């Protein structure tokens, strides 16, 4: 049989070693402090809360925080544009970030703001915040918001002149319910809402009933203001004049019949005459701002 002998090993001591570190990282929150990324505010937040992200400002700065100790990168998406530190995203040394869009007019609408941090291992965390921009009080665009329409009773020369001799009044108006706004009506320094006397029906007709309150004579600016959740508002004002006295200046004089020509009776002031073509005389107090009319009726002797 053929004989086979294995080659003798060489013992010169040559060797080759390669090393590769493998990093296993399954967490975006590297330092374990619970903080990664947040969207914290906008300027100006004009909603009912300063943190509700509802505004009537359409040139905004968006703010948030990112945990710099997590060694991650941040991208913020607003209105379809991804902002990084290369194109408008600013991050300071404390991890406060901002995107300044004051040079961009954003149309009314709801904008999902998306902030995403990603580390070198590919772990990521995303937070989203809807920002509502609403710059119009007339939400449905029908031209109607709020109006002051009438008082009861309007006893002036016109039924719509808001001049009355009634000092126990009901004030009426309308509000557009489709605008999703709240209404406040101010009368004689008191602000009335649905919590304290303002009544609004299902058709948007509002009223404030002050028939239990005697209002002194004077001019009363009635102010009706609607405000929506974004802080937009519309105000209308109507002066209501209450005048319960004919003697405006309080001097005791209003109107008088003083004489006729010729008064041929036994007294020059007895209004008895044999003249049947007469001139009638009297006085009226011009300071009372009243109108004058005359009426005479003949009675035979």
Feature map (PLM): residue ranges:
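Surface-exposed, short loops/turns at beta-strand junctions within beta-sandwich domains
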Residues: 1-2, 100-110, 209-219
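Intrinsic disorder
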Residues: 3-11, 77-79, 84, 122, ...
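Flexible, low-complexity linkers/stalks enriched in Thr/Pro that connect modular domains
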Residues: 16-45, 125-154, 234-263
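Short, solvent-exposed loop/linker segments at the N-terminal edge
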Residues: 47-58, 156-167, 265-276
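Aromatic/hydrophobic beta-strand junction motif of beta-rich domains
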Residues: 60-66, 169-175, 278-284
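Short strand-edge motifs at loop-to-beta-strand transitions and within beta-strands
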Residues: 95-99, 204-208
């Amino acid at each position: 049989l053929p004989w086979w002998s294995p080659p003798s090993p060489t013992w010169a001591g040559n060797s080759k070693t390669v090393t590769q570190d493998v990093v296993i990282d399954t967490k975006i929150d590297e330092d374990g402090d619970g903080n990664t990324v947040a969207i914290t505010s906008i300027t100006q937040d004009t909603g009912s809360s300063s943190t509700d992200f509802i505004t009537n400002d359409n040139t905004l700065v968006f703010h948030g925080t990112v945990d710099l100790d997590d060694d991650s990168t941040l991208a913020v998406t607003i209105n379809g544009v991804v902002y990084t530190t290369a194109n408008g995203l600013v991050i300071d040394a404390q991890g406060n970030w901002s995107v300044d869009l004051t040079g961009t007019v954003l149309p009314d609408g709801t904008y999902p703001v998306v902030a995403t941090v990603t580390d070198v291992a590919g772990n990521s965390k995303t937070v989203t915040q809807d920002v509502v921009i609403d710059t119009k009080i007339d939400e449905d665009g029908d031209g109607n918001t709020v109006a002051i329409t009438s008082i009861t009773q309007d006893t002036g020369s016109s039924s719509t002149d808001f001049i009355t001799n009634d000092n126990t009044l009901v004030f009426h108006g309308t509000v557009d319910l489709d605008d999703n706004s709240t209404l406040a009506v101010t009368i004689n320094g008191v602000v009335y809402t649905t919590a304290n006397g303002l009544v609004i029906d299902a058709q948007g007709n509002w009223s404030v009933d002050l028939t239990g309150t005697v209002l002194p004579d004077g001019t009363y600016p009635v102010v009706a203001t609607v405000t929506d959740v974004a802080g937009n508002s519309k105000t209308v004002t109507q002066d209501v004049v209450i005048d319960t006295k004919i003697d405006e200046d309080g001097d005791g004089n209003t109107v008088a019949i003083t004489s006729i020509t010729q008064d041929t009776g036994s007294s020059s002031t007895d209004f008895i005459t044999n003249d049947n073509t007469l001139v009638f005389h009297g006085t009226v107090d011009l300071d009372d701002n009243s109108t004058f009319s005359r009426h005479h009726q003949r009675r035979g002797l």
